[in-house]
């Protein structure tokens, strides 16, 4: 009894890397005439698969005819179209892997691996405007992330509406991240700006004008005094301003500071007169004043009593 020719099934040519119908009875590739082909098992129930495919094909994007992807901008900006990436840059569809299939009845391990490798191939898209069937709702797609970034750059006020679209959500506002080479510098600048005008209030104009002006003497120069602001040494006969804490400053150095802060740049004491009787460290043995009466006021009560008894 003559043996009937087997029916040509689904085969995969490793030379052409494509699914083919082999040339019988040689079982060779009709394209390259190579015999390096592998049989792909048929599906268990073709009828069920045909009905399922008819329902899922409506939700599956056509990747072969996809030329561009349009993203809707905020109100008043229209739409923007992103072109196709390079052929070598393709992205798998998020969430289409599904659960791992178990080997079917009567199927060898090699046939199962072959079916997993070639029979269950999924299309790979460069950009898609439709949601793939069975995708996890919590996984954002590439076009969804681009859409949110476009919205955040053009209309930051519309970022409160993120998460209500069909593309999934990011974990937070994209504008809260450091984007680009200058992103970190921008964040540091914003943090530093938050500390502006958080110190003491400006000093009163009357108190600033009432600060005494004294002349630098050889005693000052010999002690190595310098302006704490500009770090320049004082010269004999130079006019400087003296704060209640006895610290000396150039007039052009201390006035702009006091117009913004009611404190001494060195000891942080205010001009209100609090704790101004105590000289700061380093000036305890040296008292600078604008009048000659300060030397007489330093006489102790004990010396006065001794002078009275001697008389």
UniProtKB/Swiss-Prot annotation:
Alphabetical UniProt keywords: Cytoplasm, Metal-binding, Nucleus, Transferase, Ubl conjugation pathway, Zinc, Zinc-finger
Domain of life per record: Eukaryota
Q: List compositional bias (Basic residues) regions by residue number.
A: 123-133
Q: Where in the cell is it found?
A: Cytoplasm; Nucleus
Any idea of its EC number?
2.3.2.27
Q: Where does Zn(2+) bind?
A: 13, 16, 29, 32
Regions of compositional bias (Low complexity) in chain numbering:
289-300
Asked whether the UniProt record includes Nucleotide-binding among its keywords, one would answer: no
Q: One GO CC annotation, please?
A: cytoplasm
Residue ranges annotated as compositionally biased, kind Polar residues, are 301-311
The biological process GO terms on file are: positive regulation of double-strand break repair via homologous recombination; protein K27-linked ubiquitination; protein K29-linked ubiquitination; ubiquitin-dependent protein catabolic process
* Zinc fingers classed as C4-type: ranges: 13-32
Q: Where is this region: Disordered?
A: 42-62, 95-133, 274-311
A molecular-function term among this protein's GO annotations: zinc ion binding
**Where does the secretion signal sit in this chain?**
none
Q: Give the record's pathway.
A: Protein modification; protein ubiquitination
Q: Name one Pfam family in it.
A: zf-RING_2
Its top-level enzyme class, in one word, is transferase
Q: What biological function has been recorded for the protein in this entry?
A: E3 ubiquitin-protein ligase that mediates ubiquitination oF target proteins. Depending on the associated E2 ligase, mediates 'Lys-27'-, 'Lys-29'-, 'Lys-48'- and/or 'Lys-63'-linked polyubiquitination of substrates. Part of a BAG6-dependent quality control process ensuring that proteins of the secretory pathway that are mislocalized to the cytosol are degraded by the proteasome. Probably acts by providing the ubiquitin ligase activity associated with the BAG6 complex and be responsible for ubiquitination of the hydrophobic mislocalized proteins and their targeting to the proteasome.
Q: What's the protein called, per UniProt?
A: E3 ubiquitin-protein ligase RNF126
Organism expressing this protein natively: Xenopus tropicalis (Western clawed frog)
């Amino acid at each position: 009894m003559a043996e009937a020719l087997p029916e040509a099934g689904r085969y995969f040519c490793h030379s052409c890397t494509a699914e083919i119908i082999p040339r019988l009875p040689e079982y060779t590739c009709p394209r390259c005439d190579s015999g390096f082909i592998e049989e792909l098992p048929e599906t268990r129930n073709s009828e069920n698969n045909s009905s399922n495919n008819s329902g899922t094909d409506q939700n599956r994007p056509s990747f072969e005819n996809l030329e561009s992807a349009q993203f809707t901008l905020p109100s008043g900006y229209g739409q923007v179209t992103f072109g196709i990436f390079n052929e070598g840059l393709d992205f798998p569809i998020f969430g289409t892997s599904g659960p791992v299939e178990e080997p079917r009845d009567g199927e060898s391990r090699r046939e199962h691996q072959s079916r997993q490798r070639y029979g269950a191939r999924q299309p790979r898209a460069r950009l898609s405007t439709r949601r793939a069937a069975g995708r996890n709702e919590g996984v954002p797609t590439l076009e969804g992330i681009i859409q949110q970034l476009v919205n955040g750059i053009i209309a930051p006020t519309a970022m409160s509406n993120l998460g209500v679209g069909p593309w999934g959500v990011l974990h937070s506002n994209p504008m809260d991240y450091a984007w680009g080479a200058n992103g970190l510098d921008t964040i540091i600048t914003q943090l530093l700006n938050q500390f502006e005008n958080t110190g003491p209030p400006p000093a009163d104009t009357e108190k600033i004008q009432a600060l005494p002006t004294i002349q630098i003497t050889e005693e000052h120069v010999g002690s190595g005094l310098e302006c704490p602001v500009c770090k320049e040494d004082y010269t004999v006969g130079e006019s400087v301003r003296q704060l209640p804490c006895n610290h000396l400053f150039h007039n052009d150095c201390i006035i702009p500071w006091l117009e913004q802060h009611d404190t001494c740049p060195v000891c942080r004491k205010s001009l209100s007169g609090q704790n101004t009787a105590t000289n700061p460290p380093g000036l305890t043995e040296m008292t600078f004043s604008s009048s000659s009466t300060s030397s007489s006021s330093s006489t102790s009560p004990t010396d006065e009593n001794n002078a009275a008894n001697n008389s």
